Amino acid sequence: FADNAEEKELADYGMLLWGNANYNFNQATMGFNTDASFNYAFANGRGWNQQHLVTYMESHDEERLMYKNIMYGNTSGAYSTRDLATGLKRNEMAAAFWALTPGPKTMWQFGELGYDYSINTCTDLSVNNNCRLAVKPIKWDYLANTNRKGLYNAYAQFLKLRNNPSYTNDFISNKYTVTSNGVVKSMQLNGDSIKLVVLGNFDVNPATANVAFPSDGIWYSMYSNKYQSVVGGSASVTLQPGEYYVYANKNISTVTITDVLNRDMPELKIPVTITPNPLRTSATINYQLTESGQLSIHAYD
């Protein structure tokens, strides 16, 4: 939109500005360390006073992370970021940094499921730069894929945490530091209500790094049973390629996102309207569910 000095001033006046972090995040998910720093993706990294940078990893104007993972990802021996399951886990690692670093965010449709059709996909599924505006496949069937649903659940957990009313002020504060020039990247949130450390190895080989923590003591992994003992303000960690952790300074019980069971509930009355009625060839069905889940509608004449 403008140079950084002008955007900083506009942010001080209250304007929200786009923060395009597509290239850097994608370099990291593909396993390359060149141009893979996240520092400039967040307001503190730009020297802003206000957390008014709307950070995004994907958009209507940028290539899909998963598409480039599969097409161009880095490899080392048997480890390949071009593998679907591996690439999805790396997108999950990137999403942890994107979601849990303070400031507003934008996510693009189906990114939470690892959408892997190019932004230039044509209606015949070929890829051509002239097809930027072509209709893209709608992939609700991704939800049936265990690895894709795992990415979806991770997004849900990250957003559930940052939307917790107890921590709202921490996720709009400037009390964080992003260290992301190396292959092991980290984010430290030194909030008043919660303190977090996100760390991950974006290399395609094991890596060891000394990671700073906001305070000494026991830090609890939020999405596994691990914990990290910290002495002297930092800890040496060795991570496998694509391995990441979200540590908190207290043991927070997180609710696991699970699928709603498919079940028939004939006794449940669901408001339904069908227009027009009577109908000829097509109709619009409006309904309201009491809980989210898969729905099957059968119409009989």
Report each predicted region and the residues it spans:
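Short, small/polar residue-rich loop motifs at catalytic or cofactor-binding pockets
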Residues: N49, S292-Q294
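Active-site-proximal helices and loops of the catalytic beta/alpha 8
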Residues: F1-E62, M71, G87-K105, G111-I194, ...
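Non-cytosolic beta-sheet module surface loops
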Residues: G200-F202, V211-F213, P276, N286-E291
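C-terminal beta-strand-rich structural cap/linker in extracellular carbohydrate-active enzymes
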Residues: V231-I257
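Surface-exposed, proline-anchored Ser/Thr-rich loop/turn motifs
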Residues: L261-L289, A299-Y300
